[in-house]
């Protein structure tokens, strides 16, 4: 009887030990999703959002943020990724590029005395040079011989008479004064040079040199009335005359 009682007690103890092991295993399985959610917060948030009611979404997100901070504490290299030199260089390049683009967008064009400037600073964009006619140059030189400096009313009157702007007259007089001073330093007489240049510019063509279209007339070559080439036909014999001469020689 004692042996049977001992066998029953051994079976009961083995059953109780097996049941305790099963309870511990089930408890570990229930705690493992919580640990997994602590290490992988994104999956836990997705799982909770898909299977739970929307009213519990705020609680799950808050728990997910806490678990995310804990995961960053567990992996410190992830928290220092934003301080990497590559990301810092990219951020610095973007900031410098945005700062460089700001002044270009704020630039405005300003026109001063016929010259275009950007914000009143920087390089000037020069307009093309003004080409004066011979009559305009003669009037400007004549007025420059009278006076090298013009008052505002005189400049306006001269510009209106020549059909140019006051700025063009002002610039022409400035350039003329600088050339005049250079010629004086070189020991030349600028007035004589101006008079010579004016006579050459306004003098008619020399009659000793015939024009190109009068060369044929000067040589006495006759031209046919309805042709543009001079009559050189007497230099060449026609093919009919060549055949007649050959038949006579035979």
Swiss-Prot record:
Residues 84-98 have a biased composition (Polar residues). Gene3D superfamilies: Homeodomain-like. GO terms for biological process: cell differentiation; embryonic skeletal system development; regulation of transcription by RNA polymerase II. Residues 125-184 bind DNA. It comes from the Eukaryota. The keyword Nucleus applies. Keywords: Developmental protein, DNA-binding, Homeobox, Nucleus. Belongs to the distal-less homeobox family. This is Homeobox protein DLL-1. The gene is dll1.
